[in-house]
């Protein structure tokens, strides 16, 4: 049986990011190699590209606060200006159309709509007007808007809730405020937006923001990092994720009951996963592969599909893993019309002994060590210190999802490889190879029954940080040629 499909989607995401070059000749491979109803597109996230962090009535988010702490971000970079999309979005939308894109995926900044984080603080009509103009421009250029409601930019006030966990049944994500924000989005934009995602990569938000402390909110246990002011890496990631599931399910219920019948849209969640292969061909390392998948992918997919967390997590975490009530389980189960999957890389997984019981954290709970190297050799070409080019992984993720999770409608919402040097940005043939090979393995998955969508995460466009001038890279011209329609 083939994977269940809605309208097919292939999103090739562009994070506006690095420079102009000549075309590179590759064997002919085009949109016509895919089903005719595939949609090809690009995308990014509000904090990463909008800028204008104090303009247009916008309030601060936890990322504004976090990046302004010296030393938290490499080179003390911030999103204060970013790519200045807020002022230059028409130019960028035109670039997307020039590349023959069919869709644009973007997120809505919570505090650009609700500057104080809650409905009681008032709706920022200037922010609503900005997104209305963006949506209208995307549609006017013949593209489809795909909108993410939450991409990590929580209002700072709601972050204080975590300090009272687990005594209070809240997380950093205040569920009512989030539901109010989502409803404003549905009400203001839902007549034109037909594809919604509630959360983008909640794994990253929970594990890195509350386990490792390297992302906002910057919380972790002192034995994980002395740079964290406070936190409990053994519990907070699981508590935050639990309330994300409840917030997601409540918003999906809201959309399905109040808006979907008339707006006729779809709604889902975007999750991220790596693929894993055994470090050694042993039963122990094959078990480490499954645990790695359960603790990253299953942490989100199992509740969405089955109504509870994976058995491995339940068995090993004990009371550190929150429990759903029967009513909550029923609400979370099936709370999606589609699943978005972000895939970047594959790692080896090796089984390791149980961790020190006095220094528990999300990072060690799976009892698996993951690495991109075996015997000193990388699993694939290394794009960044943590990302390796391993095209078969995208096929394996799709087919695993089909087998394990009852054949959901899937969109690959992010996939890609970054630059490490300026010359690579100027002549990015490696990215063309990345796209070409991953698309070939997507085709393999289609032949094995999958066929919903694909998206690339890293830059087809270079933005000069001093002048904010946009330059197209070789890969953008390859994509333009790949997507060219024959009339």
From Swiss-Prot:
The keyword Transmembrane does not apply. One of its GO terms (molecular function) is beta-D-fucosidase activity. It catalyses: Hydrolysis of terminal, non-reducing beta-D-glucosyl residues with release of beta-D-glucose. Its EC number is 3.2.1.21. Glycans are attached at residues 76, 116, 369, 418-419. It is an enzyme of class 3 (hydrolase). This is Putative beta-glucosidase 35. It comes from Oryza sativa subsp. japonica (Rice). The lineage of its organism: Eukaryota, Viridiplantae, Streptophyta, Embryophyta, Tracheophyta. The gene is BGLU35.
């Amino acid at each position: 049986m083939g994977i269940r499909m809605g309208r097919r989607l292939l999103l090739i995401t562009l994070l506006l990011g690095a420079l102009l070059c000549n075309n590179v000749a590759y064997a002919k491979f085009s949109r016509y190699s895919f089903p005719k109803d595939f949609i090809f597109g690009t995308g990014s996230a509000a904090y990463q590209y909008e800028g204008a962090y104090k303009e247009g009535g916008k309030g601060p988010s936890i990322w504004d606060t976090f990046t302004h702490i010296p030393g938290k971000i490499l080179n003390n970079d911030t999103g204060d200006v970013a790519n200045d999309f807020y002022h230059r979005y028409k130019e960028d939308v035109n670039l997307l159309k020039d590349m023959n894109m069919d869709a644009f995926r973007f997120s809505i900044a919570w505090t650009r709509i609700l500057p104080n984080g809650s409905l009681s603080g008032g709706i920022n009509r200037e922010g609503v007007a900005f997104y209305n103009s963006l949506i209208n421009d995307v549609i006017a250029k013949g593209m489809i808007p795909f909108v993410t409601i939450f991409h990590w930019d929580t209002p700072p006030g709601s972050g204080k809730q975590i300090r009272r966990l687990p005594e209070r049944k809240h997380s950093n994500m205040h569920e009512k405020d989030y539901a109010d924000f989502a409803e404003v989005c549905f009400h203001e934009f839902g007549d034109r937006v037909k594809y919604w995602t509630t959360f983008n990569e909640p794994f990253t938000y929970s594990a890195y923001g509350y386990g490792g402390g390297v992302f906002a909110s910057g919380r972790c246990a002192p034995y994980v990092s002395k740079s964290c002011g406070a936190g409990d890496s053994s519990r907070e990631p699981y508590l935050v994720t639990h309330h994300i599931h409840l917030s997601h399910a409540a918003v999906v219920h809201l959309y399905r009951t109040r808006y979907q019948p008339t707006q006729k849209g779809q709604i889902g969640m975007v999750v991220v996963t790596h693929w894993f292969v055994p470090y050694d061909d042993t039963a122990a390392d094959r078990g480490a592969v499954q645990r790695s998948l359960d603790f990253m992918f299953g942490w989100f997919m199992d509740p969405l599909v089955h109504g509870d967390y994976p058995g491995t997590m339940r068995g090993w975490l004990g009371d550190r893993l929150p429990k759903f009530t029967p009513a909550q389980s029923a609400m979370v189960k099936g709370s999606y019309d589609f699943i978005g999957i972000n895939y970047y890389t594959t790692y080896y997984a090796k089984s390791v002994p149980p961790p020190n019981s006095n220094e528990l954290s999300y990072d060690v709970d799976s009892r698996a060590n993951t690495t991109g190297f075996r015997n000193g050799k990388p699993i694939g070409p290394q794009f960044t210190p943590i990302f390796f080019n391993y095209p078969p992984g995208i096929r394996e993720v799709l087919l695993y999802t089909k087998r394990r999770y009852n054949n959901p409608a899937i969109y690959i919402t992010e996939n890609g490889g970054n630059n490490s040097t300026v010359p690579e940005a100027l002549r990015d043939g490696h990215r063309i190879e990345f796209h070409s090979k991953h698309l070939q393995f997507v085709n393999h998955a289609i032949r094995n029954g999958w066929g919903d969508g694909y998206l690339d995460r890293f830059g087809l466009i270079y933005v000069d940080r001093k002048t904010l001038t946009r330059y197209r890279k070789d890969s953008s011209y390859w994509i333009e040629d790949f997507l060219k329609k024959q009339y």
